[in-house]
């Protein structure tokens, strides 16, 4: 007695007989190709047969794209397509011979065309998503460590496949298409990306939506941040949330346990130019937070993050020297500190010392840190730089910084940065030391305030001497 036929596949309630012979053969091959020795001994004729099945099955998908009512009849074809992709995916694992054989059959072009048809269907059945994912995995595997395959994948996939997949609602499709992009990109192709900035922006969005996904993160940190031309072209086109995401990853790169290399420094000098010039031009958007009108938190947060990047950049000796002489940066920072300090005194707003801290991550907390980081940046820019020390004096920045030294619940870290800034402003600078000593004598800076920031004034005869009570910190 013959064995009973297996139940037919089901899609959208319609019963469709499964093509048993081809499907079982493909599943057997897929299992065999999990072993390296089987991959290495596979004859090329097998891949031609798999490709023939793939092409034949793709006709049903093409028909469904032309006639949406045919989507219900795709079950058997999708089973075969999925197993073809799984078989080819496994065959390519660490086997350049198979990668080359499969590529030379023009399988890559067939796969990309089929994946684009999947996206065109706009159907989210699990069977279709599975075929979609397996197709992308195959493209990732055939391109892995194989420059010839990477070139062919790029020719067929760029830009349409990435534009179709990087913003897909399925996170696995986003991850697999990001893997293909990371694997295929090189220096020359980065230039092509500059002409298709929507793809780069989609990668930023993908990381924003799926921060746990490794591939968008690697594309940004290992590729985008090594291309100042791409970052400069892309940055003006990013919305505020996307800017914050990119700047956060830039901070992560700068503050990583692995310091910037010699090759990184010229690139990050270009980034420093972009960040500093953007901050100088746009920093006053933060003042909107002090207005009575509902502020644009996202715009202000993007500006605040620019300051955070500048603070971290000025910890690096090579980047510090460039930013210390950046035109208008120090002046703008002092001017902005003065404006928000006055705004905080005149009315009760987000910059007021009496403001209370709300939930973690609230914009008010970020704004309070903004004043601290302005003072921190002033201190960094004045580190062992007499020209900047004198410039702060000329701009009446020293009394301004001291006046900010009022500990409050809203800004518990402000005092430590005032201490740091005053130390850097007075190091080997007798003029600035004399100014602070005279301020204390005239009652413009009380002794308790100076003691709080680590100084005391001592009178020797007719001369006032500012003495430090703490060790000099580094930036």
From Swiss-Prot:
Protein name (Swiss-Prot/TrEMBL): Ataxin-10
Gene Ontology CC: one annotated term: extracellular space
Entry comment on modification after translation: Polyubiquitinated.
Family stated for the protein in its record: Belongs to the ataxin-10 family.
UniProt xrefs under InterPro entries: ARM-like, ARM-type_fold, Ataxin-10/CTR86_families, Ataxin-10_domain
Pfam family, one: Atx10homo_assoc
Originating organism: Homo sapiens (Human)
Compartment(s) where it occurs, according to its Swiss-Prot or TrEMBL record: Cytoplasm, Perinuclear region; Midbody; Cytoplasm, Cytoskeleton, Cilium basal body; Cytoplasm, Cytoskeleton, Microtubule organizing center, Centrosome, Centriole
Record bears the keyword Phosphoprotein: yes
Subunit structure: Homooligomer. Interacts with GNB2. Interacts with IQCB1. Interacts with OGT.
Tissue specificity note: Expressed in the central nervous system.
Function: May play a role in the regulation of cytokinesis. May play a role in signaling by stimulating protein glycosylation. Induces neuritogenesis by activating the Ras-MAP kinase pathway and is necessary for the survival of cerebellar neurons. Does not appear to play a major role in ciliogenesis.
Modification type Phosphoserine: residues: 12, 77, 430
GO process terms (BP): cell division; cilium assembly; nervous system development; neuron projection development; regulation of cytokinesis
Gene coding for it: ATXN10
Residues bearing the modification Phosphothreonine: 82
Lineage, uppermost ranks: Eukaryota, Metazoa, Chordata, Craniata, Vertebrata
Keywords: Cell cycle, Cell division, Cell projection, Ciliopathy, Cytoplasm, Cytoskeleton, Methylation, Neurodegeneration, Phosphoprotein, Spinocerebellar ataxia, Ubl conjugation
Modification Omega-N-methylarginine, positions: 10
Disorder association: Spinocerebellar ataxia 10: Spinocerebellar ataxia is a clinically and genetically heterogeneous group of cerebellar disorders. Patients show progressive incoordination of gait and often poor coordination of hands, speech and eye movements, due to degeneration of the cerebellum with variable involvement of the brainstem and spinal cord. SCA10 is an autosomal dominant cerebellar ataxia (ADCA).
